[in-house]
Structures are given as C-alpha cells and as structure tokens.
Amino acid sequence: MLQSNEYFSGKVKSIGFTSSSTGRASVGVMAEGEYTFSTAQPEEMTVVSGALHVLLPGETEWKTYEAGQVFHVPGHSEFHLQVAEPTSYLCRYL
C-alpha cells in the first residue's frame, strides 16, 4: 500500500511503500530550503536527482551528496539538510 506524506508546509513530499527488493522505504522530492529531520530508526538516503547539503549527527562539517550518492543516518537522531534546487531521494528504513 502507498502512503503519501507531506512536511514543512508542502515543501517536502514523499510516498512510502514496502517491496521485497527495497524493504520499507519512501521516495520523495524536496523543494529549495533548509530542513531538520528526526529519525526513529537508521536510514539510508540515496540522492536520485539534484543534491543535498547534509550535516549528520556528531559532525561539524556539511557534506554535499549528489545524484547516485548515498549517506546513512543513525536511528533516534536528527540531521540537517540544505537544498538549493528541487531534489529527489530514496529513503530506506533499515
């Protein structure tokens, strides 16, 4: 079953799903802006198009991830994103 989600007054939208090849995941798009997300469990984020400027928990330097690149976020944590152009992503819940 597909589940639609909307965050930050509609600037981030995603569709959640579960599949045998991916497990529990969501795909979505972020508009330009700055966002802080909290995680309940570990996540694997893959940038599909565009780029995400990311500050991960425990880090002091921002890192940019572009299309095809992956980063991991620990569970029960927060991470910060800066988005300069509309960017699509795949988030797998590990």
From Swiss-Prot:
Entry GO terms, CC: cytosol
InterPro entries linked: Ppnp (IPR009664), RmlC-like_jellyroll (IPR014710), RmlC_Cupin_sf (IPR011051)
Gene3D superfamilies: Jelly Rolls (2.60.120.10)
Protein's UniProt keywords contain Glycosyltransferase: yes
Class of enzymatic activity (EC top level): transferase
GO molecular function (one): uridine phosphorylase activity
Source superkingdom: Bacteria
Pfam families xref list: Ppnp
Coiled-coil region list: none
Enzyme Commission designation: 2.4.2.1, 2.4.2.2
Database matches in SUPFAM superfamilies: RmlC-like cupins (SSF51182)
Catalyses which reaction(s): a purine D-ribonucleoside + phosphate = a purine nucleobase + alpha-D-ribose 1-phosphate; adenosine + phosphate = alpha-D-ribose 1-phosphate + adenine; cytidine + phosphate = cytosine + alpha-D-ribose 1-phosphate; guanosine + phosphate = alpha-D-ribose 1-phosphate + guanine
Keywords: Glycosyltransferase, Transferase
Keyword Glycosyltransferase annotated: yes
Role according to the record: Catalyzes the phosphorolysis of diverse nucleosides, yielding D-ribose 1-phosphate and the respective free bases. Can use uridine, adenosine, guanosine, cytidine, thymidine, inosine and xanthosine as substrates. Also catalyzes the reverse reactions.
HAMAP family: Nucleos_phosphorylase_PpnP
Listed PANTHER family: PYRIMIDINE/PURINE NUCLEOSIDE PHOSPHORYLASE, PYRIMIDINE_PURINE NUCLEOSIDE PHOSPHORYLASE
Family per record: Belongs to the nucleoside phosphorylase PpnP family.
Name of the molecule in the record: Pyrimidine/purine nucleoside phosphorylase
Annotated source species: Cronobacter sakazakii (strain ATCC BAA-894) (Enterobacter sakazakii)
Gene symbol of the encoding locus: ppnP
